[in-house]
């Protein structure tokens, strides 16, 4: 049987991103409805797609549709013959293509608004709001975020919702399944928004809602076995984080001991991390694991380096070098076994496992237009450039919460599935300044105390990510009767659904007091603790 691609396994909704801060939420809402969807940049040429979507959603955008540099969709999308939903800018783009008028409006709408649904009496035109219960006053609360709006309907379109200041809040084509809404149904501030999206993807597009982690496991295991064959071997880097652990366990379930995990100790891991990961993967999960201690090499190359991008490149390049050397040993052993045992031996090592997630893919997309690469992700690209291996990424289509759900279904213990994310470059990007053994030891100790206190307070599972950053500043303090001049650490904790946006976590004051007291008393060289209360955006989760 030929390898089945995901689009042949699941009906797919195509989301075309025009750079909206909410675009990823459209994807999340579809996934929550057990509908598979994929987001691509708005510049995507439809003729280049190897698959046909069941429907298309056009996202919002910070641009004005009539601006000279405004992004525009490939007109071929309207010849696919599938349902289309435009959200905010997407509505305006539909109007532009079909001959409507969009202008800057004197009364901009930002925040909550109440829309009135207009029934046309025709099933296809009314489908977007069909079955949605209105509020007591007959309206529907939604979230607006637009300065431009549709001022004249395109030919053959009708109004299906309005507000006092926006007469064309939602529109539908008279005879084709093309819809547009000026509000944002994907955000939580539109209470019935998910139902609007459900009406489009399920009722209008008739998508089969087969996307779930329960259905994903057997299909992905079958796909892996088909790719690797009966004897093909796979190597993969693991860190002890959720992504690589779940990927390793899934691979082990598919091909057993033909999967070889490699952990590279780069010297900037969490306290005792290498020992903990070795036990976790080998004893608890039964995965073949080799741990390579390359800390001396990494730290030597990081000496004197302060720039975060240089740190990333040094760690990334050194990791590749060390990983390739260890992989070569495993490949040589496989070749030797093949020569000695012939047909009874396992096959060659042909594949490289990576735990890439869908947010990595989204944030790594770079194109001319409203979206741009936010930062280089260590999971995307780089490792295969010098290796004669083919890439296998079983988690590439998944969000973090889906990966955790997958891990639970694979019977990975909760304390492993629930671990907070840890960056590929490790503590090097949590040390603002030069990375030295002394700085690493300080940060490891402070971070260990912080996480211990968060767990003790019963808050760990309520927080999406928590860590300590070591700042490149010193502050005056008092210890006993003596003046101190020591370093400052920042503690960070965020809550998020998918790490595309995040809010800072509100700790009880007594917990923060305990954290600060323990760190300043127990960590030599630190006399001040600050708490980071920055959301994403405008900040990122990590400091560097």
Curated annotation (Swiss-Prot):
Give the catalytic activity: XMP + L-glutamine + ATP + H2O = GMP + L-glutamate + AMP + diphosphate + 2 H(+)
* Any single GO BP term: GMP biosynthetic process
Positions of ATP binding: 239-245
Q: Which GO CC annotations does the UniProt entry carry?
A: cytosol
Q: Which PROSITE patterns match?
A: GATASE_TYPE_1, GMPS_ATP_PPASE
What residues does the GMPS ATP-PPase domain cover?
211-419
Q: Which InterPro entries match?
A: Class_I_gatase-like, GATASE, GMP_synth_C, GMP_synth_GATase, GMP_synthase, GMPS_ATP_PPase_dom, NAD/GMP_synthase, Rossmann-like_a/b/a_fold
Name of the protein: GMP synthase [glutamine-hydrolyzing]
**Source organism:** Cryptococcus neoformans var. neoformans serotype D (strain JEC21 / ATCC MYA-565)
């Amino acid at each position: 049987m030929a390898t089945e691609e995901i689009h042949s396994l699941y009906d797919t909704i195509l989301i075309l991103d025009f750079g909206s801060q909410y675009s990823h939420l459209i994807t999340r809402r579809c996934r929550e409805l057990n509908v598979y969807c994929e987001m691509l940049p708005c510049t995507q040429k439809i003729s280049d797609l190897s698959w046909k979507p069941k429907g298309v959603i056009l996202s919002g955008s910070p641009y004005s549709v009539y601006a000279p540099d405004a992004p525009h969709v490939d007109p071929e999308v309207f010849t696919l013959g599938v349902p289309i939903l435009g959200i905010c800018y997407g509505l305006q783009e539909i109007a532009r293509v079909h001959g409507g008028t969009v202008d800057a409006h004197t009364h901009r709408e930002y925040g909550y608004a109440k829309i009135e649904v207009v029934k046309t009496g025709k099933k296809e035109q009314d489908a977007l709001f069909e079955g949605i219960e209105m509020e007591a006053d007959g309206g529907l609360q939604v979230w607006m975020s637009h300065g431009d709006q549709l001022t004249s309907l395109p030919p053959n379109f009708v109004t299906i919702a309005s507000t006092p200041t926006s007469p064309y809040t939602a529109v539908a084509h008279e005879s084709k399944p093309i819809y547009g809404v000026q509000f944002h149904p994907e955000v939580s501030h539109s209470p019935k928004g998910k139902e609007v999206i459900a009406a489009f993807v399920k009722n209008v597009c008739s998508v089969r809602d087969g996307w779930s982690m329960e259905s994903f496991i057997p299909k992905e295991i079958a796909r892996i076995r088909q790719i690797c064959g009966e004897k093909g071997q796979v190597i993969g880097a693991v860190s002890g984080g959720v992504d690589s652990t779940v990927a390793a366990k899934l691979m082990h379930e598919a091909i057993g001991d033909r999967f070889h995990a490699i952990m590279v100790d780069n010297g900037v891991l969490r306290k005792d991390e290498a020992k903990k990961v070795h036990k976790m993967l080998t004893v608890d999960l039964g995965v073949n694991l080799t741990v390579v201690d390359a800390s001396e090499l990494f730290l030597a190359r990081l000496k004197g380096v302060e720039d975060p991008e240089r740190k990333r490149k040094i760690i990334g390049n050194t990791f590749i070098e060390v990983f390739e050397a260890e992989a070569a040993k495993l490949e040589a052993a496989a070749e030797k076994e093949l020569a000695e045992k012939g047909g009874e031996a396992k096959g060659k090592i042909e594949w490289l496992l990576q735990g890439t997630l869908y947010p990595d893919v989204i944030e790594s997309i770079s194109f001319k237009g409203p979206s741009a690469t936010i930062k280089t992700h260590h999971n995307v690209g780089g490792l295969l450039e010098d290796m004669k291996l083919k890439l296998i990424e079983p988690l590439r289509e998944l969000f973090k919460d889906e990966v955790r759900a997958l891990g639970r279904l694979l019977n990975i213990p909760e304390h492993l599935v629930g671990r907070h994310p840890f960056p590929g470059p490790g503590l090097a990007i949590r040390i603002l300044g030069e990375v030295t053994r002394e700085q690493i030891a300080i940060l490891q100790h402070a971070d260990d105390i912080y996480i211990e206190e968060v767990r003790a307070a019963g808050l760990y599972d309520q927080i999406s990510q928590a860590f300590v950053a070591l700042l490149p500043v010193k502050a005056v303090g008092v210890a006993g009767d003596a003046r101190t001049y020591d370093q400052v650490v920042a503690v960070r904790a965020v809550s998020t659904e998918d790490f595309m946006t995040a809010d800072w976590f509100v700790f009880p004051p007594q917990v923060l007091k305990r954290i600060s007291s323990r760190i300043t008393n127990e960590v030599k060289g630190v006399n001040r603790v600050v708490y980071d209360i920055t959301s994403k955006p405008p900040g990122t989760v990590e400091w560097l």
